[in-house]
Amino acid sequence: MLKRKQSSRVEAQPVTDFGPDESLSDNADILWINKPWVHSLLRICAIISVIPVCMNTPMTFEHYPPLQYVTFTLDTLLMFLYTAEMIAKMHIRGIVKGDSSYVKDRWCVFDGFMVFCLWVSLVLQVFEIADIVDQMSPWGMLRIPRPLIMIRAFRIYFRFELPRTRITNILKRSGEQIWSVSIFLLFFLLLYGILGVQMFGTFTYHCVVNDTKPGNVTWNSLAIPDTHCSPELEEGYQCPPGFKCMDLEDLGLSRQELGYSGFNEIGTSIFTVYEASSQEGWVFLMYRAIDSFPRWRSYFYFITLIFFLAWLVKNVFIAVIIETFAEIRVQFQQMWGTRSSTTSTATTQMFHEDAAGGWQLVAVDVNKPQGRAPACLQKMMRSSVFHMFILSMVTVDVIVAASNYYKGENFRRQYDEFYLAEVAFTVLFDLEALLKIWCLGFTGYISSSLHKFELLLVIGTTLHVYPDLYHSQFTYFQVLRVVRLIKISPALEDFVYKIFGPGKKLGSLVVFTASLLIVMSAISLQMFCFVEELDRFTTFPRAFMSMFQILTQEGWVDVMDQTLNAVGHMWAPLVAIYFILYHLFATLILLSLFVAVILDNLELDEDLKKLKQLKQSEANADTKEKLPLRLRIFEKFPNRPQMVKISKLPSDFTVPKIRESFMKQFIDRQQQDTCCLFRILPSTSSSSCDNPKRPTVEDNKYIDQKLRKSVFSIRARNLLEKETAVTKILRACTRQRMLSGSFEGQPTKERSILSVQHHIRQERRSLRHGSNSQRISRGKSLETLTQDHSNTVRYRNAQREDSEIKMIQEKKEQAEMKRKVQEEELRENHPYFDKPLFIVGREHRFRNFCRVVVRARFNASKTDPVTGAVKNTKYHQLYDLLGLVTYLDWVMITVTICSCISMMFESPFRRVMHAPTLQIAEYVFVIFMSIELNLKIMADGLFFTPTAVIRDFGGVMDIFIYLVSLIFLCWMPQNVPAESGAQLLMVLRCLRPLRIFKLVPQMRKVVRELFSGFKEIFLVSILLLTLMLVFASFGVQLFAGKLAKCNDPNIIRREDCNGIFRINVSVSKNLNLKLRPGEKKPGFWVPRVWANPRNFNFDNVGNAMLALFEVLSLKGWVEVRDVIIHRVGPIHGIYIHVFVFLGCMIGLTLFVGVVIANFNENKGTALLTVDQRRWEDLKSRLKIAQPLHLPPRPDNDGFRAKMYDITQHPFFKRTIALLVLAQSVLLSVKWDVEDPVTVPLATMSVVFTFIFVLEVTMKIIAMSPAGFWQSRRNRYDLLVTSLGVVWVVLHFALLNAYTYMMGACVIVFRFFSICGKHVTLKMLLLTVVVSMYKSFFIIVGMFLLLLCYAFAGVVLFGTVKYGENINRHANFSSAGKAITVLFRIVTGEDWNKIMHDCMVQPPFCTPDEFTYWATDCGNYAGALMYFCSFYVIIAYIMLNLLVAIIVENFSLFYSTEEDQLLSYNDLRHFQIIWNMVDDKREGVIPTFRVKFLLRLLRGRLEVDLDKDKLLFKHMCYEMERLHNGGDVTFHDVLSMLSYRSVDIRKSLQLEELLAREQLEYTIEEEVAKQTIRMWLKKCLKRIRAKQQQSCSIIHSLRESQQQELSRFLNPPSIETTQPSEDTNANSQDHNTQPESSSQQQLLSPTLSDRGGSRQDAADTGKPQRKIGQWRLPSAPKPISHSVSSVNLRFGGRTTMKSVVCKMNPMPDTASCGSEVKKWWTRQLTVESDESGDDLLDI
């Protein structure tokens, strides 16, 4: 989406085709170029110009010679037109001179280059017509750039109404991200390329006949099929008798004949790794490696390659595109516009009552007569009965069309019952259309898009019933009637509209994809049309099919390999790079664009998300109100509450009916603390040994208190419950926020983001306090009034939102309370409620014992009693794992795993019923599960209890698995016939691994995530089934019976298809041997058979649907295409291409989009706004952030400091990174003992090792050993370097294969350190690692599901005969091989062929009636359900969950300097400042150091004390309040900064927002109190200073009062103090106090704070006070009690104030003093002599 470069004179001299309808100039001589039709003509000609390029090939001219002159004529006309345009542009703009000259404009240069290419092509064609240049010569490659002229036709649509800088920034950012991910992909390709070279090397050893001689290797010399082997006897495959294992390269075969795939050197290895990572052909490489090398090595390499490269790294591309598209969506909303209404008719609607009394939403003018039909017909047409009748007829038509099938060659097809039915339906729908036109009028009818579609179907089907057009391409109109059935389901209709949204987005993407295919096909056509022995690019249709095949990834390796073999060894690398780049763009970026568009369509508008959040919260509250149906059933029975029963009571007394639950309020609740009241009272007489009265009295008092408390709790419960619940919620939210502690950052700007957000908060506070009185001052202008009004409205909206949040919280609490009350009422009124099996009592000892056993779990977590935060212990991760489930569940997990391991040893030849050792695990599992279920049933009940065992699907599955295992163990059938009930029981027994889903909570969460999105997945499945049904019906009507052919390619007619013929055998797919003169390929004689293709046919809808389902998975569609083209006609190849395009580009990406959307919805991110999602990403990102493990620079400038500067210099780090890469290049060839190249390579590696030893030594010297050890990266480098030193020693000592292998491993380990040295690689590697961590349980779930299918596959297909893909590598003979086959199916590698091999039926196999293990037949129905269900669940759903997790985690790391929140630079700056303050590198600092940390921050985190002094105090006080003056961690300060850097109103959600605002309000109030207190002190000091200068009488009275008081307290010693002594006393007093200024909290001072006085720097010029003015002289013996001294000082001050107030003639001053006195008295704190500036200025 590039916008062209605008010149500075665009307005004066715009250029043609540079914008919609722009004009160049008003000059008459170039007036023609300004015409709009000229613009359109030039764009049309740009498209037409591609046509001659596509026809200009030697093969096309050979078949159609006149086309040579047609292309020449077209090129000549286009050449003159574009040349004239170019001259006109040059005339207007100038060629070189001027700011907007021709050569200075990019698009003008592009247009000129296209004209030059057009001239070159025309001259070349003249030479070809004159036979001067051969048509098959490479000169034709000069036409390669010509197809790019199509850009001229579409660049007009790349013009957007957005600022150019914004578009540039978006494209630059997305380009950087794609480049970064490409580097990340290249890193993994290089890594696996190096590993492949060192682990495998060459695959050149094959089994050949014993008499094979060098230079004489032919097809008949190889084994059938061609088999790789190992020359080592202990590993790999050993050739059968009559063959020997030989290196074909030594026998004379060239590299081109051996094939280009392999691990010979690093280049070929990377090429092979990329092929394997595309999941195309990788399994055959693995089989070759298994035959040539140890089995474990092949499995490890290829399975990890698929997992990391194909599933994780490549999916990061999807994440990049989705994130970029989400950002672009907001910017380009203006271009795409908002979604229009579903109908294009009237937008104004109203409710209308229909005939049945219901209400319908119809257009306002629907009742107005629009056509000429009578009113009764119009009413009938609008009725729902007519609508449903038409839809039912469409349904019948679809069923009839789907019932069509092939009836044989001799059956007359033209006028059968299906044709007659089609005529009848066509007439019916024609009448429907005519009726609607009559009722609505043609204008009213055609105005609806739905009616346009119906009219198109009517016209097409009417033509279709014409006999000559029946079973032609017009059949599309008949089968498209099924699309009308979408109107039946409003949910499906809404989903379709939501998915496809405005057609502009998806339509533009489809047009872009088609244009890309045409351009790339034309380029490839001109690049390879002259290559001999290559028929894939001889004509444009063949080139288009080849490039489309690469786009779908099916067989793209075959296309590339054939081209590589044809172009030769010299050009092969360039051709391979060309195809890989095209494949990379088409499969990763282009398909990701489709996923991004669908996700964008599923995305809600921002203004609806918060409303949806509120509605969802309300819905959750409503659902929590109701009890489950299994408990509500008790409400149907009459109430029978339990009454109090007294066993020993005289019959004369009648006991009133008192509920037992009421009495338990007073009795049962105290049983754990004291004895029962009725037992204690009579026991007092007997317990009077030592003190007969005291125990009794104390016990009675205790009981009385308990009774009072219980009664009080009952009475006060309703009053306090709600307030307590709200407080608990707020505390829980605050605690959760404290524990989560992580958040975000961003680039430097002129103003700090902390300051910006602080002022936003202050504005809201002022609005909050000013909203009560709406007084307007007279001097305000109109603009100010308007602004104030908007602010007030905004505040009222926020206030209303607060009230909604609080209402929802109250509703949730009330729902929970109501649910509890309902449970309590049922428990009280129904004796059998909450009684397991209606037998065991609720509080029975046995049940309590079972509860203790069932719920016992490990819990070693310690919580802080103050904050409630969980303290992390040393092994907290291990403790968390142990406490994940209960002890009983741990036992059952272990037993289940052991039982599954035992099942893995079962096979058709080692069955559990005949192997006693395998029965042990079976008995153990059933016994343990019996004990477990009995304990859980006795503890929690079976079904009718609140916590029953069967309360969800997991409980049902547990009981089902247990019953199946128990029945099988009791039965243990000895003979199991195929397709019998016993075999079905064995298949159901294979569901045993699913027990772990129920036992592990995280696994249950995975299942919930899968099934919660079942509705959307079901709707997508319906859409794909509809698409398949449309194309299947079409295929049956066109291809039924036409795909059958004789297996002898020389026979055309069916009558001649008899006898036998010799068929060639395919020996190898990899070797490219040529037949020698007189040589024949291996083959054998077979009978001729007229039959359909083996894997598919279109004889009925069922087979057609199965074939299209396989094609939908993009497997096998190339064979379907080739068969249809070869047997029906080339024109019908369009059919399969259209279906594959719709299925691949839209159908499969629908699954990806829906699964990602459902995952986001389950994670709670689907309804988050952009700001809220960024905030969640920020919190997750900061959780991972850690302090820099970098020691400080040495203080002096000595040797260590210089070494530190050297090791931290960027040049040093880059040099080390280059050295690591250079050492990795040494592994470009395999290190083999026998290869002479290995010795110099290993010697160079030794030199590199010593360099890295020097690097580690320098770092240890610079940082000190302790500082060096702080960094994990340094530890890893030290480990690898140590291993390198050990290898050097062993290498020179032993010099064998093991030392070479160790040296290669050390280099590979060193290669991993590149990620830590590159920021982008580190970020993306973190994405993959975190994705692996978060998807651990999804991966485990996939494996468990795969294990279940593997066990079932062994039972169903363990003895199936070998076929095309079932062979010695891929079969179900054991669980291990079945797992390998299923992992191959997960990647989609020929899964359909394996399924057809498992469907083999007699007479192609040998059945057995008694045992399934004695037959080699398959199971048709079983294979169909088995493979299709497995592929859908794993490939379409589970793998897409991995994509969703990667997308989520990539957005977590998707941060650049344009982010509105904290960026990586901000975070890095904070880490550096933290290291400066945390000098001990402990990760925590004292609270008083936070203010120094905040003062050191710069950039966007800077706090300017001149402007934001109050913000600074708020931040300091927040740390002190949350941590009580203790130590704060790195994440605590980062959390506080992140909260202060965002707009909490936009970023935070409901409960978190309430808790945060409550905290900030509290902080504001406390800091305001402190500020007022300091301000008052300062004012009083100034008042006293003025009083000292003006009132000398006051001084004399004060001195006399001092003398009287001193005489009263200490008569003997009265001395007069001097000013000099005053200063000394102040200093002494100051020295006696601790320096608590830095640690002083901003709360109200307490008695423990010893107030001090010190000389203020700001008051140096003021009169100095004397001690007698403020404080009584101290006594000879100091007062030890602090409280008395405080009271004395306080009393002295109040006395002096009273004197001042009496003598002061000003009444305001006196009232001020009295108010201050009262305020001080209320505070009860010590007043210090410090001013407010002392606390504000740190």
Curated annotation (Swiss-Prot):
Annotated transmembrane regions: 37-57, 66-90, 107-129, 138-158, 174-199, 295-322, 383-403, 417-439, 448-468, 473-492, 503-530, 570-599, 887-906, 916-939, 948-972, 981-1003, 1016-1039, 1130-1159, 1211-1227, 1237-1260, 1272-1293, 1297-1318, 1332-1357, 1421-1447
One annotated GO biological process: sodium ion transmembrane transport
Keyword Hydrolase: no
GO molecular function term, any single one: leak channel activity
Any one annotated GO CC term: plasma membrane
Glycosylation sites (chain numbering): 210, 216, 1064
Biased composition (Low complexity): 1633-1648
Ranges lying in the membrane without crossing it: 270-289, 544-563, 1105-1124, 1379-1398
Region span, Disordered: 762-789, 1611-1679
Tissue specificity as recorded in UniProt: Predominantly expressed in the brain, moderately in the heart and weakly in the pancreas.
Spans within the Cytoplasmic topological domain: 1-36, 91-106, 159-173, 323-382, 440-447, 493-502, 600-886, 940-947, 1004-1015, 1160-1210, 1261-1271, 1319-1331, 1448-1738
Ranges annotated as biased composition (Polar residues): 1613-1631
The organism's place on the tree of life at top rank: Eukaryota
Reported modifications of this chain: Phosphorylated on tyrosine residues.
Domain comment, as recorded: Contains 24 transmembrane helices (TM) that form four homologous functional repeats connected by intracellular linkers. Each of the four internal repeats contains five hydrophobic transmembrane segments (S1, S2, S3, S5, S6) and one positively charged transmembrane segment (S4). S4 segments represent the voltage-sensor. S4 transmembrane segments lack some of the charged residues (K and R) found at every third position in the S4s of the NaV, CaV, and KV channels.
Record's function text: Voltage-gated ion channel responsible for the resting Na(+) permeability that controls neuronal excitability. NALCN channel functions as a multi-protein complex, which consists at least of NALCN, NALF1, UNC79 and UNC80. NALCN is the voltage-sensing, pore-forming subunit of the NALCN channel complex. NALCN channel complex is constitutively active and conducts monovalent cations but is blocked by physiological concentrations of extracellular divalent cations.
Protein name (database record): Sodium leak channel NALCN
Organism: Rattus norvegicus (Rat)
Primary gene name: Nalcn
